[in-house]
Amino acid sequence: AFAAENEETLVGFCVLGGIFSEGIDLKNDRLIGAVVVGTGLPMVCNERELFRGFFDERNNHGFDYAYLYNGMNKVQQAAGRVIRTMEDRGAILLLDERFLQRQYTELFPREWYPHEVVDIRRMQELLQAFWNEGNKGK
């Protein structure tokens, strides 16, 4: 259960598009990172396929309008929980190879640049260096 005044390490899990990924405001060091697993693409359904077909006929971007933009909006909302004020500091990890595709990277907010693609060992090194740098003045 979530405790408002938790003094210990807390790991929270949420679903993209759920209330935690969109409606919680944890400032300062209350939330120091987000690990986003998957691209947030909505399920295929008749309504979305009609929407996709409509935009494919108009501009050949039906997948983008029906699925991609919706999914990336969820990803950005979840990642946005980490940085709420100018004083906040945190790490955002995107775990899905599809995030390497241009159609996804073009939708990254400017604050996500520069970003780096790493393996698990390099990720551990970078996160340690990131937190060591942030704790120098404390």
Each language-model region and where it sits:
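ASCE RecA-like P-loop NTPase motor cores
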Residues: A1-K138
